[in-house]
Amino acid sequence: MQKFIFILILCLFGRTSYSQEVLPLREQAKWVDELLNERIEGILPGLMKREQIDCWVLISREYNEDPVLKTFLPAEWLSARRRTMLVFYLNPQTGKIEKHAIARYAVGKSIPASWDMQKYPDQWDALVQLIASKHPTTIAINYSNDFAHADGITHTEFDLFKKYLPDSLRKKMVSAESLAVAWLETRTEREIAIYPKLIQLTHQIIQEGFSEKVITPGITSTDDLVWWFRQRIRNAGLDTWFHPSVSIQRKDSVVFDHLKAFSDRPREDILQPGDLIHVDIGISYLRLQTDVQEHAYLLLPGETQAPASIQQAFSKANRL
């Protein structure tokens, strides 16, 4: 049986076993909690000052979490617990963040519990009392018309919060949109240092998926490859934050439609020599995500490299 060689258009990485580079879950949890504490102490004060927000309130009930609130939970918490209320106050005298969890217990090691249940049996009363004691100029809540991630407070929680707030505090309510987006998009130096390895792991998974170990021309389908990527990511101890996609461009009479290739492609489209294969995958690790797309060309019999037209197209595209 003739073997077909795959030429990866983008750069390749070494053959190091990426599964051996992924930390055990227990070690990952330690990293996640350390990185979270660094983020709260290191970047949140500057972001709140920049966005002119001195009090940020996040409220979620268990299993219906605000996506931003979830980023403040410790690694062992897979969801909020009952009703979780977090308050971050930027002290103007010290310039430091005061962290409070109006909850039955501390939220990990980073956010201590601040609910005196004997004095304030009603959790909402405890929240309002804490906010009032800080005399904030703004009370930022996660609601937004434009950014879904910054629109995490539910209708019920929003209405209850307004109901309990006195008029003097209610008029200070503002959208936390700019702060929520800034929190999600800003990374610490330590997180940035992790990203090259995370990108490399993603490329290595793609490299293996584009190899003869996985693809047999005339037999392997795009859906076979999609599910191979999904399973390989899981087997490596990683997660994926969106379902992988694999599409094909080939010489035929059908005009290529990128929307159809993404959402309405044949699930059993068999890979053939001469195909230009495209993959889009993203992995999650230590609460960081990648989003990587690569192409590969499947050589026709007698070819030793991709056609000049394809090489030229990628040379021009890679200038960006």
What does each of the following model-derived ranges do?
Residues 4-13:
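Sec-dependent N-terminal signal peptides
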Residues 15-19:
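Sec/Tat signal peptide C-region and signal peptidase I cleavage site
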Residues 20-320:
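Active-site neighborhoods and metal-handling regions in enzymes and metal-associated proteins
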